[in-house]
């Protein structure tokens, strides 16, 4: 904790901003502009709804800058069924790219597989007992950052809560982009290795993998610890 706070008194020359349903652009002085039925100054837009098949933009930021923290909470089921956290898909686009650098269901992005809630306590990902999902991976961008959310859920989702904490600041020339990929194999084969990641080229750091495993036969509920070979260059 002391290491984390050791430079808190230093001004880094950056502008901290936050995007929420209360301030969808993150602009200075634009938070809490909408009013609820309780009147001006009350929360009038604390969350957003999402129709089946709809895509909304959660964040649209002109750079350079760094996303430092993402917080989300969503329902885990609706009247139309469960698997809401698997049916909501996040996509991140850096610097006007056409193909997203991140494409992953919300639950799996926050280490909650199979659309089920789970408590996670780690440095980059933290999911609280009440369903608040946090990501602390820093994500730099030079020109532009865009994050979208698409619903593949069959029913209406009443609320999506989210916050993007970011900073407008210079980004070093050698800064790398954040990437995340979701992969699913419906049934593995005995004696055949499961490929976690393949076809990646360039320079970078592999920061880890979250895996959710399920046995289809009750007699095979024990999943032993496998070896994890890495093939580089």
Describe each PLM feature range.
Residues 91-99, 167-169:
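Short edge-strand/loop segments of extracellular domains
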Residues 68-69, 139-152, 207-209:
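Noncatalytic modules at the cell exterior or secretory-pathway interfaces
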Residues 221-233:
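Single conserved hydrophobic/aromatic residue that forms the stacking wall/gate
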Residues 88-90, 145, 160:
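Short beta-strand/loop motifs in extracellular/secreted proteins, especially
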Residues 1-84, 155-220:
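Solvent-exposed, flexible loop/coil segments flanking beta-strands in beta-rich domains
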Residues 100-106:
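Terminal beta-strand-rich extracellular "head" domains
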Residues 83, 87-94, 224:
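Short, surface-exposed beta-strand/strand-loop-strand elements in extracellular ectodomains
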